[in-house]
UniProtKB/Swiss-Prot annotation:
Keywords: ATP-binding, Cytoplasm, DNA damage, DNA recombination, DNA repair, DNA-binding, Nucleotide-binding, SOS response. This is Protein RecA. GO terms for biological process: DNA recombination; DNA repair; SOS response. Belongs to the RecA family. InterPro entries: AAA+_ATPase, DNA_recomb/repair_RecA, DNA_recomb/repair_RecA_CS, P-loop_NTPase, RecA-like_C, RecA-like_N, RecA_ATP-bd, RecA_C_sf.
Length: 346
């Protein structure tokens, strides 16, 4: 075995050769540079931002959002798009389901004029477009809706009864192998929306599984399970859903936390409703009977009136949000004036 000085010298020579061949910083000691805090894209619900542990969806990572039909998956993704745009970023939406409603997206705060939209013919085309956009280094957020709709070309060109076992899983595996490094280098967040299926013959455990094979489960830094738990009513009319999101995988913070929030029909996630729930939970808002009070000021009787008060008094809502985030240590509040630094080119 070589002596310690010789080993050190050999290592330095090897590192110099690697830097020369592959560029400076290809290999570095973990202690050489202080890692920057993970930058995030807020989800639109402070309860979900808290459950994620870092204040939102991490940039430069793969995110999977899955759940039953009409549970709020696309709504959560569109709120992330709106927040990315609000911070000065560019977002893209790969609409493989051909079901994006521009009017609904606009109501959630999405700038539909600047949103890049693609409605691809095949799964290969969708993922190739996504990969090219990511490698441009100019995109902050890309949404693929949904994995189940990424139909391989061979299946589209084949007959209706043909068997194409494992084609979609292989397609997803190859795409994620290519995209993951590029996402990290460009700081682009990729949200894959996925559907649920049931495995036949499962005796123990949940029979539910997601489409597209196992690759997405491995490559995802965050996986969100979105469920509708109750219908919100105004008298006899249904006005929205109470939604529960479980963080079933989290590589950037402790997993298995849950968040509950309201999704109102035609309006999306109720930010004010989330602030009331979290404010009461953290002790900033006092609930006495049906009355909600903040620092001696009555917000209203009943949650709906308190929600309307915060809608009309944005300064109070921002103050409550800031206090909650400071107490829980999940970063500063994102304002319209803040601009996220441009992704690093590569």
């Amino acid at each position: 075995m070589a002596q310690a000085p010789d080993r050190e010298k050999a290592l330095e020579l090897a590192l110099a050769q690697i830097d020369k061949s592959f560029g400076k910083g290809s290999v570095m000691r973990l202690g050489d540079e202080v890692r920057q805090p993970i930058s995030v894209i807020p989800t639109g619900s402070i309860a979900l931002d808290v459950a994620l542990g870092i204040g939102g969806l991490p940039r430069g990572r793969v995110i999977e959002i899955y759940g039953p039909e009409s549970s709020g998956k696309t709504t959560v993704a569109l709120h992330a798009v709106a927040n990315a745009q609000r911070a000065g970023g560019i977002a893209a939406f790969i609409d493989a389901e051909h079901a994006l409603d521009p009017e609904y997206a606009k109501k959630l705060g999405v700038d539909t004029d600047s949103l890049l939209v693609s409605q691809p013919d095949t799964g290969e085309q969708a993922l190739e477009i996504a990969d090219m956009l990511v490698r441009s280094g100019a995109i902050d957020l890309i949404v693929i809706d949904s994995v189940a709709a990424l139909v391989p070309r061979a299946e589209i060109e084949g007959e209706m009864g043909d068997s194409h076992v494992g084609l979609q899983a292989r397609l997803m595996s190859q795409a994620l192998r290519k995209m993951t490094g590029a996402l990290n280098n460009s700081g682009t967040t990729a949200i894959f929306i996925n559907q649920l299926r049931e495995k036949i013959g499962v005796m123990f455990g949940s029979p539910e599984t997601t489409t597209g094979g196992k690759a997405l489960k491995f490559y995802s830094s965050v996986r969100l399970d979105v469920r509708r738990i109750e219908t919100l009513k105004d008298g006899t009319d249904a006005v929205g859903n109470r939604t529960r999101v479980k963080v079933v995988k989290n590589k950037v913070s402790p997993p298995f936390k849950q968040a509950e929030f309201d999704i109102l029909y035609g309006k999306g996630i109720s930010k004010e409703g989330s602030l009331i729930d979290m404010g009461v939970e953290q002790g900033f808002i006092r609930k006495s009977g049906s009355w909600f009070t903040y620092e001696g000021e009555q917000l209203g009787q009943g949650k709906e009136n308190a929600r309307n008060f915060l809608l009309e008094n944005v300064d109070v809502a921002n103050e409550i949000e800031k206090k909650i985030k400071e107490k829980l240590g999940i970063g500063a509040v994102l304002t319209d004036d803040e601009v996220v630094p441009a992704p690093v080119d590569f």
